[in-house]
């Protein structure tokens, strides 16, 4: 804290200002580091989080599609099992109608599908499936119960002319199923063997010209050449050359005429008060003051007569001289004490004292 009248600085205030400035600097540095760190974390975290969420959504979508495909396959299998159960109920007797004409018989290599309970009409031949694995021979099953008599599409079948169809041949293999769900990406493989070094590339194009270098120093002056020939024709003077450099300063000139007086300056500020001066000479004596009031009357004194001596006590307790020492002709009662060293002693006594002296 600096005073306006002096350059005094409080050391405690200066130390407090320095400590506060250092604390502000530390706070600014910490806030800057935290801001930069948060920005770096944001830049690195947001892309990785987006990639992670994208992978999870893609895998979830694939799993959902796989579940949907599995559900469709199960539904297809259930339908095929149901058709197999329905197809197993229509069992015909073996070798029925052998040697008789049966209009529903087809070639041996063409499978037929029979459905209940009317006469079966073979459908179109399906596409050939892939070759399956050879199966083990199964055990012969028991004979089935005889089926119900069939009917013609337009009228009832005559019992005498109803011929049992031959047993159903095994159906061909069905078409290939829907491709499965793609699997998850495998682990990264090992590093392969390093390839052969490549051949040298084509030479590159020449580079662009570089920047102009700095101006070099001036060269040395060459030798003076030979004098040229004097022209035969009239010499035409050339244009004047450039002005030369200014010459050096000349000697100082003589003193000039004194100039006119300048304007009066503004009055200066009031100076500080000077030291006190010497004391002045004494003044003239003043006039006499007014007469004071009359004082109160004094107390009566005492008189002790002893061997022709008079002892009197005045107001100040002084003892007067004997009667013999009174100057002759002092009939008015005035006396002077012996040993008049006291300049302030009174020159007269009161009337009561004079009466006592006269009586004595």
Swiss-Prot record:
<feature type="region of interest" description="Triple-helical region">
    <location>
        <begin position="238"/>
        <end position="303"/>
    </location>
</feature>
<feature type="region of interest" description="Triple-helical region">
    <location>
        <begin position="123"/>
        <end position="152"/>
    </location>
</feature>
<feature type="compositionally biased region" description="Pro residues">
    <location>
        <begin position="273"/>
        <end position="288"/>
    </location>
</feature>
<keyword id="KW-0677">Repeat</keyword>
<keyword id="KW-0193">Cuticle</keyword>
<feature type="compositionally biased region" description="Gly residues">
    <location>
        <begin position="189"/>
        <end position="198"/>
    </location>
</feature>
<feature type="region of interest" description="Triple-helical region">
    <location>
        <begin position="174"/>
        <end position="230"/>
    </location>
</feature>
<dbReference type="Pfam" id="PF01391">
    <property type="entry name" value="Collagen"/>
</dbReference>
<dbReference type="GO" id="GO:0005581">
    <property type="term" value="C:collagen trimer"/>
</dbReference>
<dbReference type="InterPro" id="IPR008160">
    <property type="entry name" value="Collagen"/>
</dbReference>
<dbReference type="GO" id="GO:0040014">
    <property type="term" value="P:regulation of multicellular organism growth"/>
</dbReference>
<dbReference type="InterPro" id="IPR002486">
    <property type="entry name" value="Col_cuticle_N"/>
</dbReference>
<dbReference type="GO" id="GO:0040032">
    <property type="term" value="P:post-embryonic body morphogenesis"/>
</dbReference>
<feature type="compositionally biased region" description="Low complexity">
    <location>
        <begin position="242"/>
        <end position="258"/>
    </location>
</feature>
<comment type="subunit">
    <text>Collagen polypeptide chains are complexed within the cuticle by disulfide bonds and other types of covalent cross-links.</text>
</comment>
<feature type="region of interest" description="Disordered">
    <location>
        <begin position="174"/>
        <end position="360"/>
    </location>
</feature>
<comment type="similarity">
    <text>Belongs to the cuticular collagen family.</text>
</comment>
<keyword id="KW-0176">Collagen</keyword>
<protein>
    <recommendedName>
        <fullName>Cuticle collagen dpy-2</fullName>
    </recommendedName>
</protein>
<dbReference type="GO" id="GO:0042329">
    <property type="term" value="F:structural constituent of collagen and cuticulin-based cuticle"/>
</dbReference>
<dbReference type="Pfam" id="PF01484">
    <property type="entry name" value="Col_cuticle_N"/>
</dbReference>
<dbReference type="GO" id="GO:0042338">
    <property type="term" value="P:cuticle development involved in collagen and cuticulin-based cuticle molting cycle"/>
</dbReference>
<feature type="region of interest" description="Disordered">
    <location>
        <begin position="127"/>
        <end position="158"/>
    </location>
</feature>
<comment type="function">
    <text>Nematode cuticles are composed largely of collagen-like proteins. The cuticle functions both as an exoskeleton and as a barrier to protect the worm from its environment. Mutations in dpy-2 affects the body shape.</text>
</comment>
<keyword id="KW-1015">Disulfide bond</keyword>
<keyword id="KW-0732">Signal</keyword>
